[in-house]
Amino acid sequence: EGTLAVITKCLLRLVPKPEASLSVLVPYADLKTGIQSVLTILRANANPTAVEFMERKVVALGERFCGVSYPRPDAGSYILLTFDGRSEEVTANAARVRSLALQNGALDFIELSDARQCADIWRVRGALVKAVEAVSEQEPVDIVVPISRTADFIRFINDLEAQSGMQMVSFGHAGDGNVH
């Protein structure tokens, strides 16, 4: 995402349709712990095809907007991941991430094997920009930071929120450092 770029080379790699797909929702007590866990997960070569992070307060906006509830409303943040590939790869990668997540402060590890629940969870995630726009005069903006600095950036946003009194929410693509 962005508007300032010069493309000098483009490579396209086609991959076959995955045999299996599994999304998981991983709640954490706070966003800092969740973001730090993402770095561990990415270093483990578990190859998630989606890695999203969301603060609880933005999830609450999405829940009201969509009329759907996330599990573990006691969580301060969530990481939403998807694994695609051969069945045995998906199972092994999810098991590896489960272990890492729980070792790194996850409150739970929820496999979204029920198609309806998975669709609802992703529908809320997909509607977060619209949910924020519905309660805000400001248009959400995208900021990209190095993945290793995402937690620092979110901390800065939270400090700015406390100082200014303006409500700010954080969510985005944890796998590439894109913060909405």
Question: Which residues are covered by each model-predicted region?
Answer:
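Noncatalytic alpha-helical scaffold of FAD-dependent oxidoreductases
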Residues: 1-180
